[in-house]
Amino acid sequence: VTLTSTLALMATSLMAEQIKVGVSPGEHAEIMEEVARVAEPMGLEIDVIEFSDYVVPNQALADGDIEANSFQHVPYLEAQMKDRGFALAVVGNTITTPMGVYSDKITDIANLEEGATFGIPNDPTNGGRALLVLQQLGMIKVDPEAGLVPTVLDIIENPKDLSFKELDAAQLPRSLADLDAALINTNYAIASGLSPKEDSIAMESADNPYVNVIAVQKGNEDAPWVKTLLEAYHSDEIKAFIDESYHGTVI
C-alpha cells in the first residue's frame, strides 16, 4: 500500500501543472501560500511570487512572467488596464480588506487637530479610496462627480483644514512618525506588524466596492488551472484559515 501511495504521489507530481502567482506582502501572500498547499493535491503547483509594490505585479502578468496575480481590487485593475494598456481579465473574487486609519500620535480620530497632515497612497485608485474613507468618517467632503477616484483637488469641504502627503502605499507604515495619521491598506499594515483590529483608530466600512480579485492574461480565463486555483481559494480550508488568522479584519 505504501509503495502504491508513493507511486501515485509521484505520478501526480509529474502530471501537476505549475504556475506562478504574484502577490503583495501581508495577507495576500499569506493566504496564497495556504492556497498553494491546498491546491497541490489537486494537481496544481503554485509558486508564490511576492512583489513589494502595486505596479509590478500587473506588468509581470502582462509580460507573461507570472500566470496570475492576487493583490488588487477591481477599480485599481481597471485603472491600470486603462492607463497602461494591459490585456488582463478577472477570473474570481478573493477577499475584502477594509482600509484603516493609523496614527502614532492619537488614539481617537475625533482628537485630530486642525491642520493635521494625513498620509494617503499616491496611486489614483487607492488615494481616491483613502479620501472616500475620510469622507465616510465625516472629516472631508469630495465632489461626487469624481466617483471612486477623487483627488485632493476634488475636496469641496475640509473643516479641519487637513493637508495631505501622497506617498507610495508601501511607505506609509514607515512614515507614521512624520505624519499625524495615515490611511493604510490592510496588506501593508499587516506586513509592517500593525494589527488592523488593535492598532487602527478608524476603519473603512466593510460594505465597499473594493473586493480583491485574481487576474490572468486575457485569453487564459478558461485555462484548466484557473478552475483549480479558484476551487482551492474558495475551499472551506482557506475560509477557516482566513477566519482564524485575521479575526474579521479580512473578509
Locate each region found by the language model.
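Ligand-binding "clamshell"
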Residues: A79-V91, D104-I106, D178, L183, ...
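Ligand-binding clefts/hinges and TM-proximal coupling segments of bilobed small-molecule sensing domains
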Residues: P124-I140, P144-P150, L230-I251
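Periplasmic-binding protein-like
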Residues: N93-Y102, I190-H234, I251
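Short, well-ordered beta-strand elements
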Residues: E17-G26, L44-E50, T117-F118
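Short helix-initiation/N-cap motifs at beta->coil->alpha
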Residues: V48-Q59, A146-R174
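A conserved helix-loop-strand patch within extracytoplasmic ligand-binding domains
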Residues: V91-K141, K239
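Beta->alpha turn/N-cap motifs
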Residues: G26, E50-Y54, G64, N69-E78, ...
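Pocket-flanking alpha-helical
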Residues: Y54-G85, G100-Y102, T107, G127, ...
